[in-house]
A protein has these predicted regions:
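Bacterial N-terminal signal peptides
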Residues: 13-26
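Extracytoplasmic/lumenal domain signature
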Residues: 59-75, 109-135, 151, 166-198, ...
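Repeat-blade elements of multi-bladed beta-propeller folds
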Residues: 38-42, 84-108, 136-165, 199-227, ...
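Intrinsically disordered, low-complexity Ser/Thr- and acidic-rich flexible linkers and loops
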Residues: 79-83
Length: 369
C-alpha cells in the first residue's frame, strides 16, 4: 500500500445515509475514463457505475428513439443447433474510442461502430462445437474487459471464457496477440496450487484491470450436495502484455498462510470453492484489488470443514503487485446456504462529519449492504 494513503473501510450505507455526502469525481479522475465511454462492467474499475454525461434528463427521456439494433452472434448458432440453449443475455456493453464491445452467452465477442451499430470485427472460438453445456449456470457470459497500454497506443479486449482460457484481442481489429500466453491464449487450468477438476469449472465474468495487471476469478460448480473435495477458487493475476502469471491468492489458505487455522482438521487440504465468480473492484491509488468471495464446498453442509473458514464469504483487499492479503472482512463465519456476494463492491469517497473516508459499499444476499 502506498505510504500515507488512507485504506478503504467497509461501511454500512444504510447507517450513514442521513449524514454522508458521496463524492465520485475523485474516483472517476483516477480511473481515467473519458466522458461518454464505459471501460468496465461498472464503467470503471472502481465499479462506480456513474456517468458524468447530462444530455439525457427526466425532461427529454420520453423523446429517445432507437438509433440502431444489433442481432447477437449467438442467434444464428442457436437456430442451426437445437441442443444449444443459452441463458439470459448478461453482458454489459463497453464503449471506448468509438467502438462498442459486447460478448454473447456462447462465449463470442463483437466490436460495433457506436454510431451505426455496424460490426467492425467479431470473434467466435466456437466453444459450443465441443461442449454440451458449461458447468453450473450453462451458457451465459457476463462481459469483457478493456485495457489501454500506457506505454503505447495499444488497446486490448480481455475475455475469460467457457473453454477455460483467457484471450487477448486487439481492440481495433479483433486479432489475437501471438505473444500473449500461447498464440493469444492463457490456459487457466494451469498454475493452481493444487489439483483441480476442470470439468467442474468455467469462466464467464470480466477480469479486473489494474495498471498492467489482469486479475481473474472463476466459477466452480457448486450444485452437488454430496461434494466434499472440490477445486479451489484461487484468484490469479497475469501480465497484460505477456500473459505471464504474476501471483496467486489462495482464497482457502494453504500450509502456514494466514487464516489456515480457521479450517480445522486440516480441511483446507481438500475443501474448495470460495471463489470470486462475480466482479472485483480496483483502487490503483491504494494499490489494492477487492475480492468478493463465495461459499466453501459444499454450499449446504459444513460438517467436514469446522471453523470460520477464511476467506469464504469475505471482502479481501489484496495488494495488486504482490498478491498478498492486506485486510479482510468476513461477513459470514463458516458459511452455509450460498449467502455469498453476488456482485462486485462499489468504491466510494465519502465525507462523514467533515472527515474524508475511502469506503466500500457491498451488496449481499444477507439482507445487509
Amino acid at each position: 500500500m502506498p505510504t500515507g494513503q488512507q485504506p478503504r473501510l467497509l461501511v454500512s450505507i444504510t447507517r450513514l445515509v442521513a449524514f454522508v455526502t458521496v463524492v465520485t469525481t475523485g474516483l472517476l479522475s483516477e480511473a481515467q475514463v473519458p466522458d461518454g465511454e464505459w471501460h468496465a462492467f461498472g464503467r470503471d474499475e472502481a465499479n462506480t457505475k456513474y456517468s458524468p454525461l447530462d444530455h439525457i434528463t427526466a425532461d427529454n427521456f420520453s423523446d429517445l428513439e432507437i438509433a440502431w439494433r444489433w442481432t447477437s452472434l449467438s442467434r444464428a448458432v442457436v437456430e442451426e443447433n437445437e441442443r444449444i440453449r443459452p441463458s439470459a443475455f448478461k453482458s454489459s456493453p463497453l464503449m471506448a474510442d468509438g467502438l462498442v464491445y459486447v460478448s454473447t452467452a456462447l462465449g463470442q465477442a463483437a466490436a460495433l461502430d457506436a454510431g451505426t451499430g455496424e460490426p467492425v470485427w467479431t470473434y467466435d472460438p466456437r466453444i459450443y462445437d465441443d461442449m454440451e453445456r458449461p458447468p453450473n449456470m450453462g451458457w451465459h457470459h457476463r462481459g469483457l474487459s478493456y485495457w489501454k497500454d500506457d506505454q503505447s497506443d495499444d488497446a486490448r479486449i480481455f475475455m475469460s471464457n467457457h473453454d477455460l482460457k483467457l484471450v487477448a484481442l486487439n481492440a481495433r481489429t479483433g486479432a489475437r496477440y501471438p505473444d500473449f500466453g500461447e498464440n493469444g491464449y492463457v490456459d487457466l487450468t494451469q498454475g493452481y496450487g493444487r489439483a483441480i477438476d476442470a470439468s467442474r469449472m468455467t469462466y464467464s465474468s470480466p477480469v479486473a484491470v489494474a495498471g498492467d495487471t489482469i486479475i481473474t476469478g472463476s466459477i466452480v460448480q457448486d450444485t452437488n450436495i454430496r461434494l466434499r473435495e472440490a477445486s479451489p477458487g484461487d484468484v490469479r493475476a497475469y501480465d497484460a502484455r505477456t500473459g505471464v502469471m504474476k501471483w496467486i491468492f489462495h482464497t482457502i489458505p494453504q500450509g502456514d498462510e494466514f487464516g489456515v487455522d480457521s479450517w480445522q482438521n486440516e480441511s483446507w487440504r481438500y475443501s474448495g470453492h470460495t471463489n470470486v465468480w462475480s466482479y472485483m473492484a480496483v483502487d490503483e491509488e491504494l494499490g489494492l484489488v477487492f475480492l468478493p468471495t463465495g461459499t466453501p464446498s459444499n454450499d449446504w453442509y459444513g460438517g467436514m470443514r469446522p471453523g470460520n473458514n477464511l476467506f469464504a464469504e469475505s471482502i479481501v483487499a489484496v495488494d495488486i503487485e504482490t498478491g498478498q492479503r492486506v485486510w479482510h472482512f468476513q461477513a459470514i463465519h463458516h458459511g452455509l446456504w450460498d449467502w455469498d456476494f453476488p456482485t462486485g463492491p462499489n468504491l466510494l469517497d465519502i465525507t462523514v462529519d467533515g472527515r474524508e473516508i475511502k469506503a466500500i459499499a457491498q451488496v449481499s444476499k444477507q439482507a445487509f449492504t
